[in-house]
Structure formats: structure tokens, C-alpha cells
């Protein structure tokens, strides 16, 4: 492989119409890597961008990636979890990425755990026995406010007597805004002001923003299918285009023209300079110019 490759540092903010990766070398070699390069960049940039949007609207509340079961295959699940972490997710329910990539693993009990016992309280006690220092209970299998939270509080009191503080509860269905407000009141009244409320169920940046605008009492979000598939906009339109040829040591710009304006390429071997405010340290603009 005789090509030179320049790339924006992974995890950096990048804007439309800017080169993310530039490859310079023999034309046949440059062309051979097109499909794989676009496959990697488009998929993972898509998921990282979607995650970043959710992280921003969550306003400091953790976003955890829960999407493997709805991903478009094993590679999409694993690489999507990686991209989500780069995009700002705090953790992933994908244990492969924990073991092989060092991404923190997270997760809670399943509804099937609760259903496999004769009663909800029994299932909570069994879970607390296994995870006394990391007890986070799923409370919506039957009835959140009449059953789930009262039973969780009973188990939390039992843990407290043994010297453990519970992590909290998770709600995966129902009127999330209303249920979290009532849950917060019940937990606080029982002396568990530090217990966290985690929610899931088809979350994305739009639903997260709506819940927070309603005053929902949420500490973190588990986000699945709408993150791992970027459901609202599932295609990242990155392209790989010839922009220059070198002839006798001279760079000759090349352009693709079209009646469709968005299909017209920007010619030339380019370089990006990012401009920061010297007083605030904030990014202010990008300058795209010719490499020389």
C-alpha cells in the first residue's frame, strides 16, 4: 500500500462539505479502498452523531447504549456500540465491546427475570441477594406505582439494614413523565433520595427533550433501536470523490459537475484549519483551503 492518508481525529466535530479523510496515492490503490472506507466512516459517523445529539439534549444525564438486539447484524451492534461511546454514551449493554474494546458495560434485570418467579417481591429479593451493592430494579413488569415501587422500597430497606445503598430503579413502559414524577416522590419519602431513576423505551433525542420539558424526574436514559439504527435519519451520506490528479509534480484539480447542485464536488487537494477563540477556547469556524 503506497498511499498517504490524512484523517480528522476520531471523535472530533466535523461539518458538511469538509473532507473527513484524504487519501493520496496511485489511483488503482486509492480506488480499491473506497467501499470499505465508506462502510466504516458512514456507519460509525452516523451512530456517533445520533448519540451526540441525545447526549446534548440530556443535559448531563447519562446515555447508555442498549441497541444490540435491534442492530443490523453483529458487526453493526459491536461497531455501533463503539461509535456510540465515541459520540458520548457513558456505557453499553454490549458485553463484547466491554471485553474487547474496554467500553464500560451496563445493564439491568430483564422482565423475564421478574416473570420467572412466583412474585415480583421474590424476584427483587433474589436479585438484591446477587447484586447487593449494585441493585437496580426493573419496576414496570406489572404495575409501577402499585407494585413495582412499593416492592422495590421493601427490598431497598432490607439492603439498607445490611449496609448497602441501592442504585435505583428502571422504568421501561407507560407514561414515563408521570411515572417518574410519582416514583421520585415515593423514593424520597422512603428515604432513598439518592436512588436513581433510569428510563428506556424507544428513546431518542426528541423524546428525551420532550420528557425533560415535561419535568420528568430522570437520572439516565437507556437508548436502543433509535440509536443503533439512527432511526430518524438512517443514512449518513458520506462520499469518496476524486478531487485532484498529480501530473509531473503538479496538482491538477478535478470536479464532478451535475444538474443536481448537491452532486457537484469541490475540487482541489484540501486542508482544514480550525479557528478557536483565544479568550474562550471555543471553536468559532473552520477554514477550508488548498493544501499548498
PLM features per residue range, with description:
Residues 111, 200, 224:
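Residue-level "edge-of-site" marker
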Residues 188-190, 195, 203-292:
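Gly/Ser/Thr/Ala-enriched C-terminal appendages of enzymes
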Residues 2, 6-193, 204-207, 213-214, ...:
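Buried, small/hydrophobic-residue-enriched core segments of structured protein domains
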Amino acid at each position: 500500500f503506497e498511499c498517504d492518508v490524512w484523517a480528522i481525529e476520531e471523535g472530533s466535530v466535523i461539518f458538511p462539505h469538509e473532507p473527513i479523510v484524504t487519501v493520496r496515492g496511485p489511483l488503482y490503490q486509492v480506488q480499491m479502498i473506497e467501499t470499505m472506507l465508506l462502510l466504516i466512516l458512514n456507519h460509525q459517523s452516523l451512530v456517533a452523531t445520533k448519540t451526540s445529539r441525545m447526549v446534548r439534549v440530556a443535559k448531563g444525564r447519562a446515555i447508555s447504549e442498549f441497541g444490540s438486539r435491534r442492530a443490523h447484524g453483529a458487526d453493526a451492534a459491536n461497531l455501533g456500540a463503539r461509535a456510540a461511546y465515541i459520540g458520548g454514551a457513558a456505557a453499553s449493554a454490549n458485553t463484547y465491546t466491554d471485553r474487547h474494546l474496554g467500553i464500560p458495560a451496563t445493564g439491568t434485570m430483564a422482565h423475564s427475570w421478574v416473570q420467572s418467579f412466583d412474585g415480583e417481591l421474590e424476584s427483587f429479593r433474589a436479585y438484591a441477594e446477587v447484586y447487593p451493592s449494585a441493585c437496580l430494579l426493573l419496576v414496570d413488569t406489572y404495575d409501577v406505582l402499585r407494585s413495582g415501587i412499593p416492592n422495590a422500597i421493601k427490598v431497598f430497606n432490607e439492603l439498607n439494614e445490611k449496609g448497602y445503598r441501592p442504585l435505583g430503579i428502571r422504568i421501561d413502559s407507560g407514561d414515563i413523565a408521570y411515572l417518574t414524577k410519582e416514583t421520585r416522590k415515593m423514593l424520597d419519602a422512603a428515604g432513598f433520595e439518592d436512588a436513581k431513576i433510569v428510563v428506556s423505551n424507544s428513546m431518542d433525542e426528541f423524546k428525551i427533550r420532550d420528557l425533560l420539558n415535561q419535568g420528568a424526574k430522570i437520572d439516565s436514559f437507556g437508548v436502543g433501536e433509535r440509536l443503533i439504527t439512527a432511526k430518524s435519519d438512517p443514512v449518513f451520506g458520506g462520499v469518496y470523490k476524486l478531487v485532484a490528479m498529480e501530473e509531473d509534480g503538479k496538482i491538477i484539480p478535478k470536479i464532478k459537475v451535475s444538474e443536481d447542485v448537491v452532486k457537484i464536488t469541490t475540487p482541489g487537494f484540501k486542508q482544514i484549519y480550525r479557528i478557536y477563540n483565544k479568550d474562550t477556547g471555543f471553536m468559532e469556524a473552520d477554514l477550508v483551503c488548498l493544501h499548498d
